[in-house]
Amino acid sequence: MDQSGMEIPVTLIIKAPNQKYSDQTISCFLNWTVGKLKTHLSNVYPSKPLTKDQRLVYSGRLLPDHLQLKDILRKQDEYHMVHLVCASRSPPSSPKSSTDGESHGALASSTNSNSDHSDSTTPSPSQESLSLVAGSSEGLRHRTLPQAQTDPAQSHQFPYVIQGNVDHQFPGQGVPPGFPMYPAFSPLQMLWWQQMYAQQYYMQYQAAVTAQATSSASSAQHAASSPLNLAHVPGEEPPPAPNLVAQENGPENVQMNAQGGPVLNEEDFNRDWLDWVYTFSRAAVLLSIVYFYSSFSRFIMVMGAMLLVYLHQAGWFPFRQEGGQQQAPNNVDANNEGQNANNLELEEMRLMDDGLEDESGEDAGEDASAAQRPGLMASAWSFITTFFTSLIPEGPPQVAN
């Protein structure tokens, strides 16, 4: 392209990031460099910024001075948006508003009046400085009034928000009065969520403290009641049988689910016909194998054993019921033996304190311990019966009447 073709006019829209000036439309040519554009802006821009203090940004890219506009700007765009950023060494002066002019006029009139009446009244330096500060900050107060204005209903509902943030700027200061601080949530909703969160946290903390205090109190009570049981009178002890009956009649341990409810066992429900067919088919296969590959007597023995196991699981033959019924008397005897042993220990301690202990008590204790030792046959029979009865599966627990 020849030199004459380079003289193509282009329109730039200069935007200031501080929004002190409106968007300025600048006409230039594509063969201009960035440095030449800065020189042109120093002459035509309202703040007259220096060339060395200007920074031009286009499409998020900082433009160096040696590049030409034809290499930077997009050809398909009619208008090109360029951001002008000035360094802090020579910040652009803010435009003078009408309020500033009025304030300066008021200051001039007050100064003239003070000079006219200087012979009668002489104002103090503090009053002059106060008037100057008030006059200079008039425009600033006029500009920042819409930002500091808040909703009167919100300020009435939440006065502590205004009082607690007098010296601190919060995000809602620069928002118009009709626009909420957070568009999606109102302050009342956020305050309610914070209150609910604090309440839930406090409830969990109280539950944890209560559980810890209950466990420590129960352990301390158990430790305090244990020495009292050793020093009680034998005749005043209540019978232990009701305690055992209450434990047997107590609710069973229910297995809980992960979601909080009890675990539902599928075997507790009624079986359908498909389950029964599957069970009978397995039994038929087992019996057919035993019948065809064994003798008739073994087949009868296997059938009888299976029937016995089934009746035991159904609750017809509870093998361990006798032991369960004798458990309470055995516990009573064990408690009585423990009480007798405690009484013997107390008696021995009293005899040792009195100095009346002799060797006859030791011989009698050895004879009693030797008489209580089971024999060899009794131990063997107990081992065999316990081993074979443990092979039989336990039936459902018996319901106490």
From Swiss-Prot:
Q: List the disulfide bonds.
A: none
Bias (Low complexity):
88-98, 109-126
Q: Name one GO biological process term.
A: spermatogenesis
Q: Where in the cell is it found?
A: Membrane
**What membrane topology does the UniProt entry give?**
Single-pass membrane protein
Point out the signal peptide segment.
none
Spell out the protein name for this chain. Answer: Homocysteine-responsive endoplasmic reticulum-resident ubiquitin-like domain member 2 protein
Native source species: Rattus norvegicus (Rat)
At the highest ranks, the source species' classification is:
Eukaryota, Metazoa, Chordata, Craniata, Vertebrata
Q: Which gene encodes it?
A: Herpud2
